């Protein structure tokens, strides 16, 4: 095989991967499954091409058939990969969570985005008498929390608009309305840092930064009583951004450009 043939082979392989990813994204948007014709229409590929790629994905359990009724949906192997990635991120970030919690003497958490909410993957609760306590696994509105804002700010504009919807729920008198939030998210994209000042729960503030890792985007947040927030905001921002740098250096960044 000459160099030209090798380059053509590489280009073809990349195209197949891109098409497979497009098909999996289409199925991800339709958890109940899609027919071959529907998939082909959504991804803009011939049905025969979709069939070949689906067959290959099915062999790896990344896609599964729906049965006699026909159609396909995402397969169990994808969930296993996601669980493995989450296990990896938890074990890798845990020491940094502990260090940050000890340094600031406040509750800290690691979260991911799930639709219009954040999902708390792990947390360290402060040992101070006046503290904020929250469970692992809790789902919290992304638009009203610092952890959610940094994750929303990382989304492409079209995806962000869909995630926010037409109207945002109001939780407190400080909850940002849609226009104000969109403006703030633009600033968060530049700074990589966000705050929530009594926007979700009265008396509770949070500060967060985005973790850009090869395992995906996550947020690292400090959650604390509002009574201590204003005096410590600069210290917290500095500590969060330092932790972000340490974590991304240890794990590896997904992108070269800072958020």
From Swiss-Prot:
Location of the IclR-ED domain: 89-253
SMART domains: HTH_ICLR
Pfam families documented for this protein: HTH_IclR, IclR_C
GO molecular function, one term: DNA binding
GO biological process: negative regulation of DNA-templated transcription
DNA-binding region residue numbers: 36-59
SUPFAM superfamilies: GAF domain-like, Winged helix' DNA-binding domain
Keywords tagged on the record: DNA-binding, Repressor, Transcription, Transcription regulation
Domain spans labelled HTH iclR-type: 14-76
InterPro entries (UniProt xref): GAF-like_dom_sf, HTH_MetabolicPath_Reg, Tscrpt_reg_IclR_C, Tscrpt_reg_IclR_N, WH-like_DNA-bd_sf, WH_DNA-bd_sf
Keyword Transcription regulation in annotation: yes
Summary of the function given for this chain in its UniProt record: In conjunction with SrpR represses the srpABC operon.
Name this protein carries in UniProt: HTH-type transcriptional regulator SrpS
Organism listed in the record: Pseudomonas putida
Designated gene of the protein: srpS
């Amino acid at each position: 095989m000459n160099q030209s043939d090798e380059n053509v082979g590489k280009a073809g392989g990349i195209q197949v991967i891109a098409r497979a990813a497009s098909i999996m994204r289409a199925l991800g948007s339709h958890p109940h499954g899609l027919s071959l014709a529907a998939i082909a229409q959504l991804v803009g590929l011939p049905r025969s091409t979709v069939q070949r790629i689906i067959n290959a994905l099915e062999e790896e359990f990344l896609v599964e058939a729906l049965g006699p009724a026909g159609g396909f949906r995402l397969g169990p192997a994808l969930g296993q990969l996601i669980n493995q990635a989450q296990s990896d991120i938890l074990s890798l970030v845990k020491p940094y969570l502990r260090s940050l919690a000890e340094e600031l003497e406040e509750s800290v958490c690691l979260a991911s985005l799930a639709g219009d909410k954040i999902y708390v993957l792990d947390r360290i609760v402060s040992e101070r008498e006046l503290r904020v306590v929250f469970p692992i696994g809790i789902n919290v509105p992304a638009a009203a929390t610092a952890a959610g804002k940094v994750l929303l700010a990382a989304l492409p504009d079209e995806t962000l608009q869909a995630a926010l919807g037409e109207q945002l729920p109001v939780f407190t008198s400080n909850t940002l309305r849609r226009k104000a939030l969109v403006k703030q998210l633009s600033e968060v994209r530049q700074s990589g840092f966000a705050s929530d000042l009594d926007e979700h729960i009265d008396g509770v503030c949070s500060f967060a930064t985005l973790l850009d890792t090869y395992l995906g985007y996550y947020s690292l947040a400090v959650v604390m009583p509002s009574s201590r927030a204003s005096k410590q905001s600069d210290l917290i921002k500095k500590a969060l951004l330092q932790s972000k740098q340490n974590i991304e250096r240890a794990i590896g960044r997904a992108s070269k450009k800072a958020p």
